[in-house]
Amino acid sequence: MPLSTVFLLALFLILVVIVVILLARTAVFPIDTAEVEPIELTQVDGESVAQRLGLAIQLKTFSSPNLEEIDPIPFRGMHNLMHTLYPMIDEKLDKEIFNEFSLLYTWKGSNPSLEPVCFLAHLDVVPADEAEDSGWKYPPFSGIVAEGYVWGRGAIDCKGVLIGQLEAVDNLLREGYQPLRTIYLAFGFDEENSGRNGAAQMAKALQQRGVKLSFLIDEGGAITTDQIKAVSQPVAAVGVSEKGFVTLRLHAKTASGHAAMPPKRTAIGALALALATLESNPFPQNLGVVQFMLSHLGKALPFMQRMALANTWLFGGLVRKQMASQPTMNALTRTTLAPTVINGGHTSNVLPAEADALINLRIMEGETREEVFQRVNNMVADDVISVLPSDAETLQESRSWNPSPVSEVDSPQFALLANLIMAAYPSTLVMPILVAGGTDARYYAPFCRNAYRFSPFVLSTEETANVHGVNERLSIANCAKAVGFYMELMRHVSSLTAEEEAAFLSEDEWEEDEKPVKERKNKAPRASKVVEPEEVLIAELHTPLPTKPLKQPASQTVAYPKQPRQVESPTEEHLTSRSENFVEDLQPLQDDDEPLTVKPMKRG
């Protein structure tokens, strides 16, 4: 046989082997989930809920890292409003106040031997520009209900979640519902400023009492209809972990002087060079998280994308490039770094002796704040530039934290949550995600393995972008459905018995082990089978269990007054009046997410 023929035959066989490997790995990549029967949620008057949410939005509950800087009046107004709108909650549940503003409610279950469940939200919001030319269609603290939405700061983050949970508890109390497991409602007041004085203190108190939580849900991902362009179905993003956080200060110090006779290195020039160097040398990518997330979309993900993600040994470079080109996906593949504040110089003809910049880093799963600090320090620190924590002398004392532990996705608690989402929002896919921002849930991680971050809202890309931005709003339909969702979730997670929990964890394993290999169900493969050895996966390569049908409770319709319940005078004095006047609709400001192309510069 001619040598050329042998070569071609060998090449053909190699190609066949490669194709077989590609197809085999692609075949086991998606995690297919059994279909769940749709359920009807409790019918709720969404407009009444929106009106009550509007009252909460009117309160300018701004937090601060320092307790003494917080205006107490809006928070007291919020407490009074909650008492006025939901008096039965104060009557039936035990209430504790932490650090003056945080609220911890305890709804005692009938079986105290079972681990409790916890629902989180926060009272505080970020500020909003109230100027007439700010771009808000309606004033940001009007709480006005118009065009099918309730408008204002905090509508989504996080007063919509807060009111949804309170409405759900109020409705269940009026139905006479008695939970099997104790239910905690934990509402912090400084989530937007790290949660140290709010959620952290409530979590500490619970842990000191020996509480171990069976389940916890906080704000987080939502149901989006157009964020994953390749998938036509709605996707519910459920946070199972969150990135770490640290802000570092770059400090440049040189001799001051006259601008007419600059030295070789100036403070501002050295600082600019350091920032350019950091932005041009991003942290390394890790595709494990993205693989884990997208595998849960099953075959809804197009074949070519599944093949690329399942075979990063061949397509890794292409996948990394694609991920890096999208800010949202890029944040899920690496620790991100962003300069946020810069200071230096006071007049045009004087060289400042010092200049500073703050850089915010969101730390990837598998890395620590100490490692991140060391990398930044090694890259830019020298005799002019020093790297320091932004608000303390040491990292341990600073407002920073490591990535949170990864919650279970093969637990009955996650299955209940995922099944309820799919049943309440038919055709929706459930995808575990790594949350890029910070939530209060991380403080409860030491005593809760099943902590999830999900807000039961169906949001467009625009609505998601408006969180912390201009024209934040929540639809009346979302207001109604969120209440029904929380009611069902509270029913299911609080009624989970120890026997059901044990059966869930053992039933499928026993059944699968007893069957011959060929007869076993097509169980979802562990994500470790589709990633390269060097990839570190979120969730320690969990395998979700097949879904189980939800128990459909008797459907009940909650009767609401046509008008929102009146607020008693102690609250009214702290509420701003609703204004019917509003500014014209302006184009919302757009963020420029284009990455810099600056390359590291040689220092002279």
Outline where the language-model segments fall:
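Metal-dependent amide/peptide-bond hydrolase catalytic core
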Residues: 2-46, 51, 221-241, 245-487, ...
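Acidic/His- and Gly-rich active-site-bordering loop/insert found
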Residues: 8, 12-153, 174-180
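Structural motif
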Residues: 116-117, 214-215, 451
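Acidic/histidine-rich catalytic neighborhood of metal-dependent amide-processing enzymes
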Residues: 149-150, 154-237, 513
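Intrinsically disordered, low-complexity serine/threonine-rich segments
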Residues: 166, 506, 511, 569, ...
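Long, low-complexity, intrinsically disordered segments
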Residues: 536-542, 550-604
